[in-house]
Amino acid sequence: MKLERKVRLCSAAAAILIAAIALTGCGGSTAASASTAASASTTVSAADNSCGEGVTWALADGTLTISGTGRMTNFTKDTPAPWADQADQITTVEVDGTVTSVGATAFKGCTALTTVNIADGVEYIEAGAFNGCTALTEVNIPQSVGYIKTGAFKDCTALTSVTIRDNCRLDMNVFPSTVEVNRAEG
């Protein structure tokens, strides 16, 4: 009886070990494992349309729409926006007014982006949010935006003018030096 139990236990342990080796790809092709991991990651990113707690994104016909309630995620070089691999397809960004912030580096490097519409209700734009959007020519910043952080529109070389509310706080180097910043009462 004890011997039979030990045999079953050893068999179960061997099965778990074999499954673990198969799942980690030990002894297999590294390129195949990396390719499989990249595909799984892409699938997860495409299926997960979250870009903040209660905030989602959708890309259709070149328009990236950010909607929901709350703050967008602040993205980084190590954790890029989930649409980063489609950045060259984005021509318009629409941010709904129930979203309270535009996340850091959210649209960085969207070189085909020409128009940004931020709805009234958004309170601030994080650092580097639109950095490197070299085709950007039109930005609609509502009166609700009270703070725009460093480099939010850095290297947006096609942008010539923007209008923001009079008491909107600007960090350093928010816009390229060639951009005319107009202040409106609000």
Give short role names for the model-derived ranges.
Residues 3-13:
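Bacterial N-terminal signal peptides that target proteins for export
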Residues 9, 62-70, 87-101, 111-124, ...:
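Structural signature of tandem-repeat unit edges
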Residues 13-24:
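Bacterial N-terminal signal peptides
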Residues 22-47:
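Sec-dependent signal peptide cleavage junction
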Residues 43-95:
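N-terminal segments that cap or nucleate solenoid repeat domains
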Residues 175-176:
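A structural signal for leucine-rich repeat
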